């Protein structure tokens, strides 16, 4: 047993360990990893788990609470407050006489720092906890051989979570599996593995139990014949292997360490960054001007400097990251309650922006419960003697690869008829696995008399290319053109009824070889057909209708026969008038392909790479493309799409490639996801437009006040408190509702619209800020230093209330409070902040920061100014919508 951690460290990833695992004889490898040919005991697994930890890759560094707290503290807002605390300490405590020391400002500002930091930390912490919880709801599994503590002989085939694997485990691999750890192959059968995630090469390569001489001294370690690395996936075939590295000790884990935390920026990230930079650019231009104007007109450069810094804080969108995170996190939690798991938070926004959904047919539009309806002879007569069924059963039963839905249907049908004993008279000799180029698979069987035959089933057109004969009425005849035509007519009839048809062929062998290859699939005898029915989901038609109503076009991308795809598509309400097949696409020019993918809704007989290519072509036309699929052949398309959607029962590689996982195969959740994505995006846009327009207007207000007033319009502490209160009022935006009209179509970032919005709406607040200046100057005679605090109190309240009211004005294109009201959290928070803002000048806290109670005659003026502000904003909103055809 492994008693010392130093014995474990040598298992960390390094080239020597990999080469040892590859080159050493099996017995040596078993001894080195202290395991047996039956696997590990449960006790040993527990020990190794405690030493190694879970078998997981940290794609992004987990954020520790202390680090998150530090990041919440390090931001422009807290930075300026900290500077103000230091200055206050120097001016009010250190340089003051003992009797004149004043700690009030220090205590107040320090309280603001603590509140601001905690607010951001809590939101970030909750978002991370939610994301981690959602990730745990989707698990990939593998089959492992383990030696029970009370049994002998092992228990092969136990399904466990990939996280529970430890070095020394023996695992079973089959088509569709993600390689769960770094593995030395000890047994294999036609094992083809895709290493594209590691090497970038799209072609799959074959792996063997033994290392070839050519690989002994040359080549990259990823090319080793008997080593499979975590992150690659099984395309076809099967294998047994011993795990020699897990988690961060794997080859993939080493790569992940170097890139952890450096996720590539998405269009969504870039949009947020553009908004932030736009606001910061305005701030960098205006703040120096404010500093110079105040310094020149007031003569106090230190005060002007502190005021300019405070203005900078007010103009900095410091809450934007928190609002975005809170919105996305809330959207993910809402979707999880609807049986939809979000692996990547940014995918929620893409869900809302999606205007084209490409979907596979089988298991997505259909029920994923295929039934074998008919098994018929070549001449179309029923297979009353079950000869066709028997051959189909052998093919499905003896294959070791991934049994697809049609294999399961055959096995289930034979079980219903009580014919499972058919296989007892035969033994398997070899198999030629399925691949998406040949679109067929073969097994070689031998009966008790030593007679061998190869049995092949696959897509009809591909099967006809390897058949030279056909069996009619028990007699084998050359396969003539008329017979081929008859076969194709029969298939079309079945396809028109929505049935999928496979052809079945066989050939007897005298050879006693034990290894067979694709070259043996020739001169075969066509013996019959299998017709399967996979009816559409009950929810498919309604879901597609609702997606269309919400501006999402649905396209079907299938590897199946064109007639079958059209039949199913018609039943679920998809337009089938324009369609194209994979072979037709191959022969098109790039320009013709581009036109075809835009025009057509039905794509059939596609290869996996063609699915991916179609998505790329659609994206080039500025579409946001989603893809829904659950098979091995869907993995490339899932990765290529803007939002990959799969189901919890999908093969590992499909789940790994997806951004969204549906826990139930109910297409109605797609509509929920689209709407939640648009709500999330809409609420983010609300904050962005509120902040942008408010900040843009405040720049002009501050500049005007700085130029014409003999004193500061507000003290730095006033600006900071006002900014903090406004920020708090925005924290409920993620819980706001969106108007139904906004949710009716896809939404994407538009930086040009944001600039227009700022220019149109921003200056409105400046008009009424200046009106407030005039009221305070002329009506309340705030024209000298003795009335400075009254002036500042008047603008403090008006500025805060107008900023908070704009939340309700901007959140909807309708008339606020009358035609559209905010959610109760938004209403409660905004009006509470407004009440707090009005009360502050009347409190001792207000006095401590230089504010003074306002005369009651001020408030009618305030109401008039705010009402006028709302009316003018609503009028300009209507005009803006009429000119630019949009609001949010």
Identify the role of each PLM range.
Residues 107-139, 146, 263-359, 530, ...:
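Hydrophobic alpha-helical transmembrane segments
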Residues 83-108, 151, 278-316, 329, ...:
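Helix-interface capping motifs at the ends of transmembrane segments in multi-pass membrane proteins
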Residues 54-86, 128, 218-227, 258-285, ...:
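Soluble-to-membrane junctions at the N-terminal ends of transmembrane alpha-helices
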Residues 74-94, 109-120, 139-140, 277-295, ...:
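Alpha-helical transmembrane segments of multi-pass membrane proteins
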């Amino acid at each position: 047993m492994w008693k010392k951690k130093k014995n474990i460290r040598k298992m960390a990833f390094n080239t020597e360990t990999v080469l040892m695992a590859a080159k050493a004889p099996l017995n040596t490898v078993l001894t080195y990893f202290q395991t047996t040919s039956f696997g590990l005991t449960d006790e040993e697994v527990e020990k190794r788990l405690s030493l190694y930890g879970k078998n997981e890759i940290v794609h992004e560094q987990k954020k520790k609470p202390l680090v998150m707290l530090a990041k919440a503290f390090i931001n422009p807002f807290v930075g300026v407050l900290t500077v103000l605390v230091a200055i206050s300490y120097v001016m009010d405590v250190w340089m003051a006489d003992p009797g004149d020391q004043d700690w009030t400002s220090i205590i107040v500002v320090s309280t603001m720092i603590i509140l601001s930091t905690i607010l951001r930390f809590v939101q970030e912490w909750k978002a991370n906890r939610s994301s981690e919880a959602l990730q745990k709801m989707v698990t990939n599994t593998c089959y492992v051989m383990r030696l029970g503590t009370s049994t002998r002989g092992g228990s092969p085939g136990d399904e466990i979570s990939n996280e529970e694997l430890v070095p020394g485990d023996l695992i079973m691999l089959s088509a569709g599996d993600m390689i769960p750890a770094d593995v030395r192959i000890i047994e294999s059968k036609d094992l083809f593995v895709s290493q594209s995630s590691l090497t970038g090469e799209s072609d799959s390569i074959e792996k063997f139990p033994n290392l070839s001489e050519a690989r002994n001294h040359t080549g990259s370690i990823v090319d080793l014949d008997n080593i499979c690395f975590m992150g690659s996936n099984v395309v076809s075939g099967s294998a047994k292997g011993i795990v020699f590295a897990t988690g961060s000790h794997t080859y993939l884990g080493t790569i992940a360490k170097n890139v952890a935390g450096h996720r590539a920026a998405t269009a969504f990230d870039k949009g947020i960054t553009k908004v932030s930079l736009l606001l910061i650019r305005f701030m960098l231009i205006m703040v120096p001007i404010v500093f110079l104007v105040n310094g020149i007109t007031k003569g106090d450069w230190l005060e002007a400097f502190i005021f300019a810094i405070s203005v900078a804080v007010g103009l900095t969108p410091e809450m934007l990251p928190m609002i975005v995170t809170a919105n996305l996190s809330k959207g993910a939690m809402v979707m999880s309650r609807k049986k939809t798991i979000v692996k990547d938070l940014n995918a929620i926004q893409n869900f809302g922006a999606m205007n084209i959904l490409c979907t596979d047919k089988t298991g997505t539009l259909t029920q994923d419960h295929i039934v074998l309806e008919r098994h018929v002879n070549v001449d179309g007569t029923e297979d009353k003697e079950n000869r066709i069924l028997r051959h189909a059963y052998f093919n499905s039963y003896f294959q070791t690869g991934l049994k697809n839905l049609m294999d399961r249907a055959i096995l289930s049908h034979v079980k219903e008829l009580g014919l499972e004993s058919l296989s007892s008279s035969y033994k398997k000799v070899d198999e030629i696995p399925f691949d998406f180029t040949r679109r067929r698979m073969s097994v070689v069987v031998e009966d008790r008399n030593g007679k061998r035959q190869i049995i092949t089933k696959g897509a009809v057109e591909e099967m006809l290319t390897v058949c030279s004969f056909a069996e009619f009425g028990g007699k084998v005849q050359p396969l003539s053109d008329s017979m081929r035509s008859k076969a194709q007519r029969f298939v079309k009839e079945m396809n028109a009824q929505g049935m999928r048809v496979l052809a079945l062929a066989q050939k007897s062998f005298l050879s006693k070889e034990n290894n067979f290859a694709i070259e043996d699939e020739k001169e075969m005898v066509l013996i019959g057909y299998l017709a399967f029915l996979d009816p559409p989901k009950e929810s498919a038609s309604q879901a597609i209708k609702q997606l269309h109503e919400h501006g999402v076009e649905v396209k079907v991308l299938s590897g199946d026969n064109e007639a079958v795809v059209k039949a199913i598509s018609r039943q679920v309400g998809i337009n089938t008038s324009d369609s194209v097949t994979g072979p037709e696409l191959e022969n098109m020019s790039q320009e013709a392909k581009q036109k075809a993918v835009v025009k057509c809704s039905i794509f059939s007989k596609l290869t996996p790479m063609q699915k991916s290519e179609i998505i790329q072509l659609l994206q080039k036309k500025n579409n946001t493309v989603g893809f829904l699929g659950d098979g091995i052949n869907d993995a490339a398309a899932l990765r290529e799409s803007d939002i990959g959607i799969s189901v919890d029962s999908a093969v590992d590689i499909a789940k790994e490639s997806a951004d969204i996982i549906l826990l139930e195969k109910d297409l109605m959740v797609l509509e929920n996801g689209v709407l939640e994505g648009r709500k999330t995006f809409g609420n983010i846009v609300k904050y962005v437009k509120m902040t942008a327009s408010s900040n843009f207007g405040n720049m002009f207000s501050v500049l005007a006040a700085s130029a014409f007033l003999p004193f500061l319009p507000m003290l730095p502490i006033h600006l900071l408190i006002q900014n903090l209160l406004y920020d708090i009022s925005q924290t409920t935006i993620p819980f706001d509702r969106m108007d139904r009209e906004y949710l009716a179509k896809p939404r994407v970032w538009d930086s040009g619209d944001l600039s227009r919005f700022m220019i149109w709406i921003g200056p409105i607040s400046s008009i009424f800020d200046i009106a407030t200046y005039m009221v305070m100057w002329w009506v309340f005679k705030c024209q000298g230093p003795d009335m400075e605090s009254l002036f500042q109190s008047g603008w403090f309240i008006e500025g805060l209330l107008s900023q908070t009211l704009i939340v309700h004005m901007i959140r909807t294109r309708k008339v606020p409070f009358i035609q559209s009201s905010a959610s109760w959290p938004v209403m409660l928070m905004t009006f509470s902040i407004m009440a707090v803002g009005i009360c502050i000048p009347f409190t001792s806290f207000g006095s401590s920061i230089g504010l003074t109670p306002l005369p009651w005659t001020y408030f009618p003026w305030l109401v008039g100014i705010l009402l006028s502000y709302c009316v003018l904003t609503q009028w300009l909103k209507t005009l803006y919508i009429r000119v630019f055809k949009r609001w949010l």
